Amino acid sequence: MAKTSWTPGQQKVIDTRDCNLLVSAAAGSGKTAVLVERIINRITSENSPINIDQLLIVTFTKAAAGEMRERIGAAIEKKVLEQPDNVHLQKQLTLLYSAQITTIDSFCLSVIRNHFHTIDLDPSFRIAEEAELMLLKSDVLATLLEEKYEEGAEDFLEFVECYSASKSDEPIENFILKLYQFSQSYPYPHEWLEEREKDFLVETAEDINQTSWMKQLLQYVKAILREASDLCAKAIEITNYPDGPKPYLDALLSDQEIIERLLNSDAGSQHSYEEYQDAFSNITFARLSTKKWPDATEERKEEVKAIRQMVKKILSDLSDDFFFQPMEDMLTDMRKVRRPMLVLLSLTHDFLERLDASKEENNLVDFSDIEHFALNILVTKEDGNLVPTKVATEMSEQFVEIMIDEYQDSNYVQEYILSSISKVTRGCPNVFMVGDVKQSIYKFRMARPELFMEKYEQYSTEEGLYRRIDLSKNFRSRAEVLDSINGVFEKIMTKAMGGIEYTKEVSLYPGAQFPEIGMDLDNTSFLFSDTKTELIILDLKEEEASIPDSMDRLDVMALEEDAIELSKRELEAKAVAMRIKQLVHGERGFSVTKRNGEEQDLKRCQYRDIVILLRTMSGWSETFTEILKQEGIPAYSDTQTGYFQTLEVKTVLNYLRILDNPRQDAPLTAILYSPIVGLSAEQLSFLRVKPGKGAEKLSIYDAARECALNYLEIQDEVTQPEETQPVYDSIIQADLMYEKSSAEKTVSMDKNLIETGEKLKRFFATYDKLREKAIYLPVHEIILEFFKETGYDLFVYAMPGGEQRRNNLNLLVQHALSFEESSYHGLFQFIRYIERLLKFEIDYGEAGGLSENDNAVRIMSIHKSKGLEFPVVILAGMGKQFNTMDAREKIVLHADYGIGPECIDYQLRTKCPTLLKQVIKKNIVLDNLGEELRVLYVALTRAKEKLIMIGSANDANDVFDKWRQDSTPGVTPLRFQTLAMAKDYFSFVGPAALYDSRIRVITLTPNDLLEDEYEKQTDIKNKQEELNPYNFLQSFEEESDEQSDEERSDEERSDGEQSDGEQSDGEQPRKDLLTKLSFRYPYEHEAMLPIKTTVSELKKLSQQVDEELTETFTQVKDELTKTWPQVDEELTEKYPQVEELIETSPPVKEESQMLIEPTIPKFLKEEKELRGTERGNLYHKILELIDFSDNKTKLNLREFVSQLANRGLIQEESISSINFERLSRFFESELYQRIQIAYQKGYLYREQPFVIGIPVREISTQKFVRTTQAQASSILSKNEDFSHANLCSCPNSQDYENDDLVLIQGIIDVYFEEEDGIVLVDYKTDAVGELGEEELIRRYQEQIRYYERALNQLLDKTVKEKIIYSFSLGKEIRIKS
């Protein structure tokens, strides 16, 4: 392998020693590889090698730490192979697993474990789970506020009156929790809170002007005024153009004078708010001259007017937002809010102390505690300064160098911890820091990118004790991708917006080599196969959006209007699906680079090469996953949302809720309506409207209990026997009287009460048993008992997506186990725990279905994609507005500027914003926009070869107009005010991309999406409802009811006919008596149902039963007819399928016709002969592994089979059993040509396993019905006491209950997709008799039917053809539906 070639910048990073080194490493610059090489260089240095455990290597995540340790280990092993006698290197391998390659949390934890005694900490502490900690905080807060209410202090009640919600203290709780979170990012939380108290102790204008927030405001105002001045100068310049409106010049000069006066007067001093306020309140704009100017064009006039309007709006907004009141009014407001804000800060102090006490009581710590405990061990205060402790000094001697990865995500506490164990304070800087401030996206975790920027600006690029090295060469992406990213960010990323100026020094430069892809010069085509970055706008306006001449139009086939209504997200997902199909399956689909060592080539883009990035997953990933699957695109979404919203988890949680407290109408109703009980909507309403005094006032629980009790009472009356009579007098008469009495009472029952009561009786029997156990069982065992008693886990496993649903339930059991390890216990606390998770939107994400190794499109959040790379990146949701909720609260909070409240007079019921709130609000918005800008940078830099950005807009014309207004060709960067007003990613990218030839801007309309060349003309929604298992069950109930009605009608007609004399008087009583005497348990066949079976078993049993029925049915029927002549007609009517089977079965050969073969012992048989099943498996294995991309000859096939044998995939001795003539005939067939086309398009699927749930009622003439009938016939035909009633009462398909589901599993040989549906193919190697095709069809049509059912149910697509390919016959056999 060739030696790695490092760039000059990378080599500097590797070699630089004895200084604090900050490495600004751009995306894809190979920082991890460089860091590993630096470490290896340090431990293998010829001059002064060190041990690996003398380095402290701090990474951001455990995964990164694991990867780093693995890379270092591999590099050391490589060195050992080069120098096998090097004892030092061998020692490093031993030390590697004890070396400090760790996250900051793990390092702090090790500090605490080793030095807990220095801070008087119990070493047996446990790290609290997030949800457990959340419950603890909730309990502490609730107790604190309850005590404050009991005390009834006036200032507390005033605070609550002003800032709480009308029916809840939730806003106050949120304020306290957020202040607590901010305080934890500082070394000493209580001190930070005390600093915030000082913000409200201002008394004079001097006090106000000295605050940090006022200084920041004045700097911001000056920056905006300079931008207004530039705009004004631009307008003046236009008036001097030959076609400019010169009469406007006077007004513009007046505007310029106003702005310059604001900038250059005493208002620029530190005591300037009053002067600014006075100046803004006295601004008067001159009117534009109406004088005609013959050379002036309307376009220039409108341009000047637009610019002037922007200037006036800038000044007006500054005045309205910040200079809306004199200083005295401001001071008055600050005095008014002082008392309630001091109450809030006091509550936060109390909460912090009580929470610490509660955690100490439960011996718990959280990650914030771990950092602060480590800080207390390593740092102490002396004369107001932070200095290292003795422990820190000792530890600093242990480490030769401290290496910090992802330094841009550090906070102040971490900075103090790592600085304390460095040698910086002793004049020997030894800290290595690597990161990229442009990728700092963890503001919500209180990351402080300012730490990085302070050093970035202070450290020199020259040699010295504090040095900076920039790595800007990108080894990840194509030049086209990098050029477009640079083109965007050089216009939108500035020091004020994003934290760093996007200059040439920080731009991305291509460092990787890629094979060339042919450019698509036909820009009118809707299939772009080049690497040009795309910005797609989905125009949701009804009429067509106009498109600038400089843009390309995505020209898809014009189609008629479709009435389907889809949401914005669904339409956007459809647009993404269409683009993915074009990339993967289009005539000129996209190609990606395939690397094999140092060699690289192009390959067709696959689904696994594509990732869809989303800013937020909640609500978006579900929609995209669903739409992509509907479009036939496999999609994998590794989301941390959606778990608690899955049907199966919601159902189990609702059951747990009613186990804890049944008098909760909502969860109880959900359970009654679920398949666990199965009440219909009509039956639920019956519980509320059934006759009875006060029924409508009962709770659902009481009404259900009453209904079940009423049903039991009536049932007792029906089944209670009459007064005993001598059975010897007339047993037949007694039976008839009993039957008549029962029938009359049953008919008198209320139908609703019977049906509802029966279901409720079963429900309460299970519920009462579980509720008793819930008192003493742990939660996870309660859930398992619930599964055992109800079988609900098996039910959901039989539903579509059953594997994932069952995984979700198993995950719930695991969460219950984890909960039991916390400080909370019992069912009630577990439900509280879940409710809190739901309230704070903490979700676990569904258990995995597809995995990241499957050929599927990935859907993930931008945050989760950080550090990853993908050949094709689609950034969706470009038009989704940014979240600004934290800037719209009554009290806004900022880590640097503290608390910004509204001034509320609860007596006068008035409120107004304080200046402090306005300043903090503006800073929150700007900070959030800077964060969004960096998130966007992370998203775009994930792309290796193709970058696509897509979003929707209500009106593309308006969007384009806004972009034109905000952008000026050649001007870099965009105006700060433009960036500060951004509402979404379109607002950032659009103006930057508008005039950039490196980005293709495309518009789509909904009509372009509803029917493209891949659109399937199906009503997806209706198909989903049809395939819903609950709807299946409901349809079976209705079918059963209809059949029962028909049977009753037939019986009534039959009775009527018999009364006319067609049946003898004595025959019916005899028949009834014999039926009663031969009574069999009515649910015997249900008791025999297996939970799971296979398609092969069903087919095999079907064949066995066919033979058995054919042989016995006629004999039994003949025997019965001797005694009861009418039995022939009854059996034929009840089992027409058996009669049909007898008629269509092949004739049984006479004994003389049968070929008698001598029996040969197995050990004398030739080993090369394979049994039919083994030969079939061999053919299947070959067809599973063979490449279908080209035609095959017998020679090709022999070579391929030999390769399989050499690789151990098949037995070499089995090759002689292959008929290559028959095998090659398959590759010459028309079917293979279709398979080959599907394979090339990626639409061929081989050896696909499945598991589906099918109601046993649908498994007609198969295992459960026919086996029982065959067994009954066989047994009873040999029994002298045989009664024909037994045979006639054998179970038929309609005898099974609606909810009897059987799991059926199988493996489909092959299926492929064509434009109008799925083609199902089954390979058969069976020898075929005289009947040929008919024999194969009869033998396998039921098996194929189950395969078809599986594909319909699991893929939600139609099977248009079912084909058996017989290798014996060498032809395709089509099975009709």
Swiss-Prot record:
Family designation: Belongs to the helicase family. AddA subfamily.
GO MF annotations, alphabetized: 3'-5' DNA helicase activity; 3'-5' exonuclease activity; ATP binding; ATP hydrolysis activity; double-stranded DNA binding
Tree of life domain: Bacteria
Protein function: The heterodimer acts as both an ATP-dependent DNA helicase and an ATP-dependent, dual-direction single-stranded exonuclease. Recognizes the chi site generating a DNA molecule suitable for the initiation of homologous recombination. The AddA nuclease domain is required for chi fragment generation; this subunit has the helicase and 3' -> 5' nuclease activities.
Disulfide bond annotation, renumbered to this chain: none
Keywords: ATP-binding, DNA damage, DNA repair, DNA-binding, Exonuclease, Helicase, Hydrolase, Isomerase, Nuclease, Nucleotide-binding
Cofactor: Mg(2+)
GO biological process: double-strand break repair via homologous recombination
Domain UvrD-like helicase ATP-binding as annotated: residue spans: 4-478
EC number(s) per entry: 3.1.-.-, 5.6.2.4
Binding site for ATP: 25-32
Pfam families, alphabetized: PDDEXK_1, UvrD-helicase, UvrD_C
Cellular component annotations (GO), alphabetically ordered: cytosol; DNA helicase complex
Segments of skewed composition (Acidic residues): 1036-1065
Catalytic reactions on record: Couples ATP hydrolysis with the unwinding of duplex DNA by translocating in the 3'-5' direction; ATP + H2O = ADP + phosphate + H(+)
Binding partners and assembly: Heterodimer of AddA and AddB/RexB.
Stated name of the protein: ATP-dependent helicase/nuclease subunit A
Residues covered by region (Disordered): 1036-1072
